[in-house]
Each structure stands twice: as structure tokens, then as C-alpha cells.
């Protein structure tokens, strides 16, 4: 509201007098002011004048927004299709889009010995020609419908995914079923795919992050363990894989009575059942017994104290602290999400705030725990400028020790609960994310209501629960340190840790030196306190 100026006669006269007085004073030039009379002193008993009161916000105090309520993920409808396929369906009719993910428990852990990457190669070949169409014709048909069909593989399972507008669902679902149930496996296409695959494996050797991930598995599980090799194999194993290996693996592993199809979006159960009968009716399970799913045992130590992949003259180094984790079905998983978020799972986590924000050693320090049918891994890591490798490693270990010994703060309890609620809501924002997330659950052998029950347990975890998990899974005392970088910059940390020499490995995790890293009378206890960050200067 605007305040109006007074327009009364008295006000007009007063303004005119003031203006006239000002004009006369200016025209006549400056005059010497009379000395001001001294202010009378207040009587001794007079109290000091009260301070001016602070301005009062007319809107009142700013209200604090309430904490977001916990979101309870819906449980998908479950039924069995013709041929024995298990189907999970979560209907979402707000947007005319449908997304489906089919998963088979045939991931890298199912690779035959010496054939690492076979599950990956098989999944990659599924959309390189299927049904009546070769690779180019199939790709064109998918594009014409505005659909997206892709394949993927991880340690436990392989996947085929479809996302398409509702109006093109029937035609796209027919192509989707061709990819899953009727791949062509043409030798010429395999030769092309294999050549690209081998080039990707060569380029992986130059990527320190990819190298580190390969080494984690090799160190933690060992070459003989089903989880001990990378999902996409190695340069050596890729050479041994032929198209006949792919056909044999597919015939054994890819069958409808092992498959779970997860669909989310604008489709009803009768509509989906009709599509399955139309497109997948010819996909029959063979009479041979169903292959047992692979659930690897926990890795067995002892593990080396420090492992190094020597990268001379590298501008950056990867530093990591590696420990065995838990399976996806372990009861620790709900609380472990929040513990990991506090130490390294988000930008505001302890590791990132220290190594990035306070010390400036890295663009980001993180931690994660893997989700697998069998034992997982817990790793905390950062990419650091090379000449800061040793102090950054000291700081990383120090942060982990303090976290394991002191547990989480009340602020971290509240923050991780809020972030957990927000993340699960984000998962259910799009049908593509829903289908992919639930297919991941199915691939791990988790029940359809796992998201609902786990989100409640995660939300209910208290400080004492999180403290116990921090101590159990993030204490670096008996962990393995993995470094991808120059040996010379690591020596200071080795001396502090009492390790005479690191175990040397190549980019595929193979031991290349027989020097075992022997502790000099102590485990990986807290290193000397890292230098305090210097105050910023202009």
C-alpha cells in the first residue's frame, strides 16, 4: 500500500515556508552560525535513555518447514505368465509411457572359468539382430517407434530394457520379445562387437578409476571367486570367447522360468498379460533342469595392507580404503545406507567436506557399498592431485578412524534420514527409474515388497544403530589401501603405516611383484594427524 502525501492547506503553507527560507539562505551566502548552547546536564538520579527498539517484522517470525513425511513405496502386483516367467507390475497412468526391464540371474558370476566376460558378451549380442531382422533393420525398427531397447550386465544378472510411448507399446513389445527370446547371434556381427569390446578393454587400462574398480575385485575376492573378475572380462579372457560360447551360454542361462519381467507405467494387468501371450508364447523352457543361481561365499583373507598400481608421471592418483561388505539381503543394509551417506555418500558428507572443501586435495571424496546377491564391498576413495597423495591418504584414514570410533552426530542422524526419504521419492518419479530399480531388486533375489519394508527400517534407525554399523564396517584398521598412482609419492604414508613395501599389481589386478606388504608391528591404525588446512589468503 502506498502512503499518500498530505494535501491540507496547513501542510501546503508549511512546505512553502520551508522552501522560501531555504532559497533566501542560499541566495545570501553562508552565515556564521551562533554557538550552540551547552546541553543541560541530567540530574544525577536520571536514568539513561532506553535503546531504540529493534524493528519488528510485520510478518512475524519465519516458520520452520516441517520435516518431509516418510514415503512408503508401493508394492508391485505379481503374477506368472505363460512359460513360467515371473511378472512384477506397478501401474502409473499419469503419463502415457511404459518401461519394462527383464532380468535373468546370469551375470559375471555365472561366467565359466577362463571365460570372464561371457555373460556380458551374450547380453551385448541380444540386440545385434533378432527375429526376422538383422542388426541394422532391428535398430531402424526400434527408432521408427520412438522406443529404446538396451542391454546390461552386472555381477549377478543380465538385463534387457524397453521404454516406449503407450501408443507404440504393442509393436515395440514384439521387438522386445525378439531381442530376449529370438536373438540371431550372427558370426559377422559378433566379430564386429568383439573388436569393439577388445578396444574398450584396452582403453580401460588408461582410466585410473576403471582400473581401481577392477583391482578392488581382484584384491578382495581373488581370481578364483565368482566376483573376482570385472563384469566385462579382461583382455586375456575376451580373446578366448567365440560365438559358439555365446550360443551355449544363452541356451543354458536364458530361459523363461528363470526370468523376471518388471513393468511400470501406463499399462494394466490384462493388457500386459495379453502382450506376453502374443509375443512370448513361443519362448519355452527346455526340459533340462533349471541352473542353480550363483550365490558366492564371503571372501576370505588375509588381504594385503597396501596395493599399488604404479602409474609413473600420472597427474592424479586414486586412493581408496577397501573392506568386505554384506549381501543385499543382510539386515544391516537399511542402516548402512544412512551410515554411508554420513561418511561419504553425498556432497555434505565428512570425507568430501574435509578432503575437498577444507583441504582442496580433490574435486570429490566418496564412499559406497555394493549391492550383490553374495558379499559386497565397501570402499572409500578420492582422486587427488599426485603430489598430495600421501597427505590425502593420511586425511582419509584419519576421517575413517574418527568416524568408526566416534560414530555419527545428531545432525548426521537427522540429515541422513531426510536424504533417505528424498532419494526414495526420486526413484519413483519416472516409470523408467521405477522399472530399473525394481528389476535390480528382483535380480538380487529380493521380494517385491523389499523397498517398502526397507524404507521403513532405514527411516527408523537410531543413532546407536548407526554408531554400531560405523564401527563394524568403516573402521580402516584391518582394511586394504589401494592406490593407482606413482610409487614415489606414497612413501611417506607407507612409513607412517609401518608398511615396508606395497603389493604391486597390474591394471587387471594381477600380482606382478612378490613383495608382500608386511606391517612393522602394527595394523593400519590411525596415522599421524594430517596437517590442518591453512586459512584462505587473498
Task: Show the residue positions of the predicted features.
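C-terminal motif of bacterial Sec signal peptides marking the signal peptidase cleavage site
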Residues: 24-27
Amino acid at each position: 500500500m502506498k502512503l499518500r502525501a498530505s494535501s491540507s492547506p496547513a501542510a501546503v503553507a508549511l512546505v512553502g515556508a520551508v522552501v522560501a527560507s531555504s532559497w533566501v539562505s542560499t541566495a545570501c551566502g553562508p552565515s556564521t552560525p551562533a554557538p550552540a548552547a551547552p546541553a543541560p546536564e541530567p540530574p544525577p538520579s536520571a536514568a539513561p535513555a532506553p535503546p531504540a527498539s529493534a524493528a519488528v517484522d510485520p510478518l512475524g517470525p519465519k516458520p520452520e518447514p516441517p520435516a518431509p513425511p516418510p514415503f512408503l513405496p508401493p508394492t508391485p502386483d505379481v503374477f506368472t505368465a505363460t512359460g513360467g516367467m515371473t511378472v512384477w507390475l506397478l501401474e502409473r497412468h499419469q503419463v502415457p509411457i511404459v518401461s519394462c526391464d527383464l532380468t535373468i540371474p546370469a551375470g559375471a558370476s555365472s561366467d565359466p572359468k577362463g571365460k570372464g566376460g561371457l555373460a556380458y558378451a551374450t547380453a551385448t549380442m541380444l540386440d545385434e539382430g533378432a527375429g526376422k531382422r538383422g542388426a541394422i533393420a532391428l535398430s531402424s525398427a526400434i527408432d521408427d517407434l520412438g522406443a529404446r531397447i538396451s542391454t546390461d550386465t552386472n555381477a549377478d544378472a543380465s538385463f534387457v530394457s524397453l521404454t516406449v510411448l503407450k501408443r507404440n507399446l504393442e509393436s515395440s513389445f514384439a521387438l522386445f520379445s525378439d531381442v530376449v527370446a529370438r536373438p540371431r547371434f550372427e558370426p559377422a556381427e559378433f566379430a564386429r562387437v568383439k573388436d569393439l569390446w577388445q578396444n574398450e578393454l584396452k582403453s580401460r587400462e588408461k582410466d585410473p578409476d576403471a582400473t581401481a574398480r577392477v583391482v578392488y575385485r581382484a584384491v578382495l575376492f581373488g581370481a578364483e571367486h565368482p566376483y573376482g573378475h570385472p563384469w566385462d572380462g579382461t583382455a586375456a579372457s575376451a580373446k578366448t570367447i567365440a560365438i559358439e560360447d555365446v550360443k551355449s551360454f544363452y541356451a543354458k542361462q536364458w530361459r523363461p522360468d528363470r526370468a523376471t519381467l518388471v513393468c511400470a507405467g501406463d499399462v494394466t494387468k490384462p493388457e500386459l498379460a495379453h502382450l506376453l501371450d502374443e509375443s512370448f508364447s513361443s519362448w519355452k523352457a527346455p526340459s533340462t533342469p533349471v541352473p542353480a543361481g550363483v550365490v558366492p561365499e564371503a571372501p576370505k583373507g588375509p588381504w594385503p595392507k597396501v596395493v599399488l598400481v604404479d602409474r609413473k608421471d600420472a597427474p592424479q592418483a586414486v586412493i581408496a580404503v577397501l573392506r568386505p561388505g554384506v549381501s543385499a539381503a543382510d539386515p544391516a543394509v537399511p542402516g548402512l545406507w544412512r551410515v554411508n551417506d554420513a561418511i561419504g555418500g553425498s556432497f555434505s558428507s565428512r570425507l568430501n567436506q574435509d578432503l575437498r572443501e577444507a583441504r582442496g586435495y580433490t574435486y570429490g571424496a566418496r564412499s559406497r557399498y555394493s549391492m550383490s546377491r553374495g558379499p559386497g564391498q565397501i570402499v572409500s576413495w578420492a582422486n587427488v592431485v599426485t603430489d598430495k597423495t600421501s597427505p590425502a591418504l593420511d586425511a582419509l584414514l584419519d576421517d575413517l578412524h574418527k568416524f568408526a570410533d566416534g560414530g555419527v552426530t545428531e545432525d548426521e542422524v537427522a540429515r541422513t534420514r531426510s536424504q533417505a526419504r528424498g532419494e526414495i521419492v526420486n526413484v519413483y518419479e519416472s516409470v523408467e527409474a521405477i522399472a530399473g530399480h525394481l528389476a535390480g531388486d528382483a535380480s538380487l533375489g529380493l521380494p517385491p515388497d523389499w523397498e517398502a519394508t526397507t524404507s521403513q527400517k532405514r527411516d527408523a534407525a537410531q543413532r546407536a544403530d548407526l554408531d554400531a554399523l560405523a564401527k563394524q564396517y568403516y573402521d580402516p584398521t584391518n582394511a586394504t589401501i589401494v592406490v593407482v598412482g606413482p610409487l614415489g609419492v606414497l612413501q611417506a604414508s607407507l612409513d607412517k603405516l609401518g608398511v615396508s613395501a606395497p603389493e604391486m599389481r597390474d591394471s587387471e589386478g594381477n600380482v606382478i611383484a612378490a613383495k608382500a606388504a608386511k606391517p612393522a608391528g602394527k595394523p593400519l591404525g590411525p596415522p599421524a594427524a594430517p596437517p590442518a588446512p591453512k586459512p584462505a589468503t587473498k
